[in-house]
Amino acid sequence: MAVLSNDQVDAALPNLPGWERAAGALRRSVKFPTFLDGIDAVRRVAEFAEEKDHHPDIDIRWRTVTFALVTHAAGGITEKDVQMAEEINRILSD
């Protein structure tokens, strides 16, 4: 899978509310009402990621969860990461 150019990532970001490009990855931080709400969101994202065999890096800091997406095997952000960001947004809105 090809790494997206900076222009391609910039074009995708307006369609990915809450996401930004940082440190070579797509990143989104979400503050949940409670710690357990954050853990539940991580579980739902993890189940989908397992199904797709594309796993975000996930950082949990009390009620704030940060998701980071980069295709390590390709060495950068790919269309697979953009699609996963869209799905994470869908999962979090449920």
From Swiss-Prot:
- What is this enzyme's EC? 4.2.1.96
Give the UniProt family note.
Answer: Belongs to the pterin-4-alpha-carbinolamine dehydratase family.
Keyword Ion transport assigned to the entry: answer is no
Q: From which domain of life does this come?
A: Bacteria
Give the protein's recorded name: Putative pterin-4-alpha-carbinolamine dehydratase
In terms of Pfam families, this protein maps to:
Pterin_4a (PF01329)
* UniProt catalytic activity: (4aS,6R)-4a-hydroxy-L-erythro-5,6,7,8-tetrahydrobiopterin = (6R)-L-erythro-6,7-dihydrobiopterin + H2O
Record GO biological process: tetrahydrobiopterin biosynthetic process
* Keyword annotations of the record: Lyase
State any single GO MF term. 4-alpha-hydroxytetrahydrobiopterin dehydratase activity
